[in-house]
UniProtKB/Swiss-Prot annotation:
Protein known as: GTPase Der
Residues noted as binding GTP 1 in the record, renumbered to the chain: 9-16, 56-60, 118-121
CDD domains according to UniProt: EngA1 (cd01894), EngA2 (cd01895)
Domain EngA-type G: residue ranges: 3-166, 184-358
Positions annotated to bind GTP 2: 190-197, 237-241, 302-305
Family matches, as InterPro entries: G_ENGA (IPR031166), GTP-bd (IPR006073), GTPase_Der (IPR016484), KH_dom-like (IPR032859), KH_dom-like_a/b (IPR015946), P-loop_NTPase (IPR027417), Small_GTP-bd (IPR005225)
Origin species: Francisella tularensis subsp. tularensis (strain SCHU S4 / Schu 4)
PANTHER family on file: GTPASE DER
Domain KH-like: 359-443
Molecular function via GO: GTP binding; ribosome binding
GO annotation, biological process: ribosome biogenesis
Oligomer status and interactors: Associates with the 50S ribosomal subunit.
């Protein structure tokens, strides 16, 4: 489960600006769902090699109707889920009753809180921060998010240590969870009312999840262990992710976080699409998130029953056009969760994807495949020199990570990287899982000797003079 940073505070203090700084600065995948242009509320960001999620809770002002109730729902859910809270206040306008209310909520929680005093450009930082110490939090820091003043220092000072500690503990916990995990852990993701809960019940063979014919019946993720044909599984039915313009209920907003975390905790992700509505930007966002996080993937196109042949052809053409990047390795099944049509094939693809993602490859095999790929198609020239790939080894599983060492590898074009991925995928018969390639510059064993020789020669020439 990813580390979560919650940005809380009243309206117009600069939360969204800080959100953009945290995400866009670190090669972020931001969930800019259709239907909203003003606020991007959910984002994945990176610090060094560590991923984390950021949520902007939206602004609240004293003039809002139902202030207490809305704030309690909106901010408390974010605070409860968060590993670190950035409590943003306005250094220009000073302390307000809205700030005091947020502070009172935070004091009730056992959370790590940093009071971020924003908009301090052109002011005395110490003076701007002074009154906010009255909240009782020992961490108060001044920034200007709009001008990125002190924002990197904010991350280095408060996020770095907490993030590293979290992932050290998390790694140990995950190792224990993997030992205790009930078989293959897979999640069902998709928009509301695409049939995830119906598919869950069909896979379980009983009505374990309440289903109504209305969007958003499942508010939170439901995790259920079961066994089928001797294979153990744990299925997670996530709440649906709808268009941002339609995300109105506060609980539903934070179900997005649950969905993203369920993806990260899964061995395999089953993306469920409504055949009659087609694939949407929300579906694509979730699929991209799963791939970016290295999850094995299966696509289930539901509600296939009752469609005309003409409509089916149109759906397949639309899928081929929008999912061109998945055509070569992800299984797509056209199913009816209600009647059970082709659901068995979904299980087969889950098993295959998991087996491929967990497949053990030796260093000898990885190097041999790399050599065969190079023999079939050599890397391009870089100036007067050809890029040379020397050897390969496996850097991890689920997803498979292939580490290739060589010279000039930083100049290897993306087209050749795609060629290597396709070559390895075909040779290893990998289905359903991404393959991650890492390229490392080989160390020159004579570099230190050359440097020493140069220094010695320099010393000798000085003596001759």
């Amino acid at each position: 489960m990813s580390f979560l940073v919650a940005i809380v505070g009243r309206a117009n203090v600069g939360k969204s600006t800080l959100f953009n700084v945290l995400t866009n600065s670190y090669d972020a995948l931001v969930f800019d769902f259709e239907g909203v242009t003003r606020d991007r509320q959910y984002g994945q960001a990176k610090y060094d090699d560590l991923d984390y999620l950021v949520v902007d809770t939206g602004g609240i002002s004293d003039k809002d109707v139902g202030f207490d109730e809305f704030m309690a729902k909106q901010s408390q859910i974010a605070i409860d889920e968060a590993n670190l809270v950035f409590f943003v206040v306005d250094g220009r306008s000073g302390l307000t009753t809205g700030d005091e209310y947020v502070a009172s909520l935070l004091r009730q929680k056992d959370k790590k809180v940093v009071v971020v005093v924003n908009k301090v450009d052109g002011t005395d930082e110490e003076a701007a921060m002074a009154e906010f110490y009255s909240f009782g939090f020992d961490k108060v820091f001044a920034i200007s998010a709009a001008h990125r003043r002190n924002t990197q220092k904010l991350v280095d000072k408060f996020l770095k240590k907490t993030l590293n500690e979290y992932y050290q503990d998390y790694t140990q916990t995950q190792e224990h969870k993997e030992q205790q995990r009930h078989g293959i852990h897979f999640s069902l993701i998709g928009r509301p009312n695409v049939g995830k809960s119906t598919l869950t019940n069909r896979m379980l063979g009983e009505d374990r999840v309440v289903v109504f014919d209305m969007p958003g019946t499942t508010i939170d993720s439901v995790s259920i262990p079961f066994e089928r044909h001797g294979q153990k599984y744990t299925i997670v039915d996530t709440a649906g992710v709808r268009k941002r313009g339609k995300v109105k209920q506060t609980l539903e907003k934070f179900s997005v976080i649950k969905t993203l975390q369920a993806i990260q905790d899964s061995n395999v992700v089953v993306a469920v699409v409504d055949a009659r509505q087609g694939i949407s930007d929300q579906d694509l966002s979730l699929i991209h998130f799963a791939i970016k996080n290295g999850r094995a993937l299966v696509l289930a196109v539901n509600k296939w029953d009752g469609m005309t042949e003409e409509d089916r052809i149109q759906v397949k053409q639309d899928l081929k056009r929008k999912l061109f990047f998945l055509q070569d390795y992800v299984d797509i099944h056209f199913i009816s969760a209600l009647h059970g049509t082709n659901v068995g094939h979904v299980f087969e693809s889950i098993d295959t994807a998991y087996a491929c993602a967990s497949k053990k490859i030796t260093t000898a095999d990885a190097t041999r495949l790399m050599q065969l790929a190079v023999e079939a198609h050599s890397p391009p020239m870089v100036g007067k020199f050809r890029i040379k790939l020397k050897y390969a080894h496996v850097g991890g599983h689920n997803p498979p990570v292939i580490v290739i060492h060589g010279n000039q590898v930083s100049r290897l074009p993306n087209s050749y990287k795609r060629y290597l991925e396709n070559f390895f995928r075909e040779a290893l018969d990998f289905r359903g899982t991404p393959i991650v390639f890492e390229f490392k510059q080989s160390e020159n064993p004579f570099a230190d000797r050359k440097n020493k020789r140069s220094k010695d020669e320099g010393s000798k020439s000085k003596k001759v003079k």
